[in-house]
């Protein structure tokens, strides 16, 4: 009989299994905490959407739409796409559910997987995990600064400090057309290949985002948007920077920065960490004042970001840090017999009701095997219960770090464990 074939995860799609998954959850939750504190409500988005949403919203000239989307026909022969980013889906939901007709700004946050067909490398996956926020309906530099400060606080709250914020302005409808003409004039004078020239015709900023060395060298002297801002766009950008200064959020103005999505206007930013090498981005975002109208809604402004959970985990590792505990439990029960097991099951549930993570040695491991399992669990304490303890009405509490053990009354064990752990 032939051996059954085995399966593995698709290329570029990571599994997060214990104990590493504990850090993943801690990073994801840490990045969302600052948004909750600022009044951002949670939104849960579909994993797939109508392909046209991303083609229109993200931009057909982007690598995301032209090269990286997972697009397929469903059984009704409708073209659908696994979501490559979150903003377009949020805007669609805001329009569909009329959230834009209530109190403004609409503040929403989300977390989950997104999908792009990229060349897999460290922290750059085909299923990427992101945390994002969107603030829709108010064109206010103070709101731009708040969104940026939320991301900064999320990273710092995890203990990350080796990152920097790069920021620029991509202008507004007043100055962008003139800048576009000047940039195209510069680009069309270069010996560009046919595909790059096509990009320059659709959205010339995309050429400045080209990662190829020869293209970057040719465009080194390209005109910069920051030198062509309208008075209104410049005043907006200056005010954003003033708010960031007041919030003590450090930044570096990068006039050559171009984000990978076409909908950005005015304030645009990226968080980078040099410990990650060439793929240094850990998150970014910006303002997208024309996107809602482009998707059929009101002409309302918006600003948001997407932060990479996978890449933040790697950035912490580059600094020799971890987020949260990788221990799967705080207390491990070691029953010496079936009667002891029945009693520890009850005690475990009582401790869990107090918010304490508890596991037990199930099966017939024997005391040696059970204690070995306790050590491997990462727990701080072991509850040891045998026939003599049952007769005495006590439970043994063992400190797994020091080996010290004490006996307490069965009636007091929950309170005593809570006191030791500070729960």
Curated annotation (Swiss-Prot):
It is an enzyme of class 6 (ligase). Its EC number is 6.1.1.21. CDD domains: HisRS-like_core, HisRS_anticodon. The keyword Chloroplast does not apply. Its main location: cytoplasm. It holds the Pfam family HGTP_anticodon. One of its GO terms (cellular component) is cytoplasm. Gene3D superfamilies: Anticodon-binding domain, Bira Bifunctional Protein, Domain 2. The keyword Glycoprotein does not apply. Keywords: Aminoacyl-tRNA synthetase, ATP-binding, Cytoplasm, Ligase, Nucleotide-binding, Protein biosynthesis. It catalyses: tRNA(His) + L-histidine + ATP = L-histidyl-tRNA(His) + AMP + diphosphate + H(+). PROSITE patterns: AA_TRNA_LIGASE_II. Signal peptide: none annotated. It is found in: Cytoplasm. GO terms for molecular function: ATP binding; histidine-tRNA ligase activity. PANTHER family: HISTIDINE--TRNA LIGASE, MITOCHONDRIAL-RELATED, HISTIDYL-TRNA SYNTHETASE. Homodimer. Belongs to the class-II aminoacyl-tRNA synthetase family. HAMAP family: His_tRNA_synth. This is Histidine--tRNA ligase. The lineage of its organism: Bacteria, Bacillati, Actinomycetota, Actinomycetes, Mycobacteriales.
